[in-house]
């Protein structure tokens, strides 16, 4: 079971705080969408509005084509999975998973069979008789997911479900969430502030900032071709180079770059750290001195002082075998296609 969601012109105020500002969004049935943004951007408020825990001040919510704007949570085809999991400590896993089915009046045998199927789906069939305090954090997270899916919601809302897990377990659970979502086909809407998590699991990322949607698209598009400077910066490290449009390109401390901008208008030229290299490229950034460098396993992260702009620090992700030391001299290159340019106000 699954359903599309349509959000139309949502606005919400908490007193004088305008938490959601004209938010409109279409989510397809069976899609895995992440709401990504910093604390206070409105992503959790938007999730709460979809779940019925907050009534929007203005706007409309359709789920499966039906108006759910003022429908209470219990009567919506949605289930919300919170970060703290909220498992019942006195119940075993089977009873935790089947609790919602019991409340809906399903017979004992049928709900226990359903619970066993879901525990098998999340890899905990053999642990059905255990209680939550006998499980690891990752196992409790999987039980909470099984319980949320037991009532067969058309939409599953996940409020930072992996936030309490350590890095290694979080990455494992990212893979499991994506696999389980593909198997059940339910629409998943997942709130996170972690851009790597969003890229790992989402079909589509919705970047939020100050109550508005800044950008939305596939992880590849959002990372490689962000629509706004905020989205570019929030999706990962980004080097900023000041520029100004001219008839022949964009004038920067590194010379005229082959980019298009309005003449005389200021601009910010952006370049990802992994786009900077020491091999040949079609654009030279000239010589630079290593300020410091650190080994990150798959790359060497270096802070570089370019000769062309010594007051600026460039961040580069260079090959892990680079073995850089402070004071080393490098010649930097990049590709014209890796630049992104954004207009700015003086």
Where are the regions a protein language model picked out?
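Helix-to-loop junction immediately C-terminal to a conserved catalytic motif
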Residues: 51
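ABC ATPase nucleotide-binding domain
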Residues: 6, 26, 62, 331-333
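ABC ATPase nucleotide-binding domains
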Residues: 32, 48, 73-230
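Conserved ABC transporter NBD signature motif
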Residues: 59-67
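Pre-Walker A (P-loop) beta-loop-beta motif of ABC nucleotide-binding domains
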Residues: 23-34, 88
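Non-catalytic connector elements of ABC transporters
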Residues: 238, 248-346
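The feature captures the beta-strand-to-loop junction immediately N-terminal to the Walker
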Residues: 36-38
């Amino acid at each position: 079971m699954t359903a599309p969601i349509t959000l139309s012109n949502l606005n919400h105020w908490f007193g004088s705080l305008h938490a959601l500002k004209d938010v409109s969004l279409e989510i397809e049935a069976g899609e895995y969408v992440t709401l990504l943004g910093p604390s206070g951007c409105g992503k959790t408020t938007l999730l709460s509005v979809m779940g019925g825990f907050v009534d929007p001040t203005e706007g409309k919510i359709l789920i499966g084509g039906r108006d759910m704007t003022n429908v209470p949570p219990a009567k919506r085809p949605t289930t919300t999975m919170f970060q703290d999991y909220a498992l019942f400590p006195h119940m075993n896993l089977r009873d935790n998973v089947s609790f919602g089915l019991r409340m809906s009046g399903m017979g004992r045998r049928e709900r226990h069979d359903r619970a066993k199927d879901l525990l098998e789906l999340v890899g905990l069939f053999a642990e059905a008789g255990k209680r939550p305090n006998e499980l690891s954090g990752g196992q409790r997270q999987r039980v909470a997911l099984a319980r949320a899916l037991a009532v067969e919601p058309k939409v599953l809302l996940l409020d930072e479900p992996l936030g309490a897990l350590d890095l290694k377990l979080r990455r494992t659970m990212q893979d499991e969430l994506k696999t389980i979502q593909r198997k059940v086909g339910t629409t998943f809407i997942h709130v996170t502030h972690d851009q790597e998590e969003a890229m790992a699991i989402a079909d589509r990322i919705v970047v939020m900032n100050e109550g508005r949607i800044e950008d939305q698209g596939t992880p590849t598009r959002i990372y490689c071709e962000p629509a706004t400077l905020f989205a570019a910066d929030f999706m990962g490290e980004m080097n900023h180079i000041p520029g100004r449009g001219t008839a022949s390109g964009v004038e920067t401390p590194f010379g005229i770059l082959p980019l298009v901008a309005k003449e005389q208008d200021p601009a910010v030229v952006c370049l990802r750290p992994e786009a900077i290299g020491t091999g040949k490229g079609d654009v030279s950034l000239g010589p630079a001195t290593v300020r410091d460098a650190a080994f990150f396993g798959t790359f060497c992260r270096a802070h570089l002082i370019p000769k062309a702009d010594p007051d600026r620090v460039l961040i580069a992700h260079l090959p892990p075998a680079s073995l850089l030391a402070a004071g080393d001299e490098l010649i930097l290159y990049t590709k014209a296609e890796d630049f992104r340019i954004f207009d700015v106000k003086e």
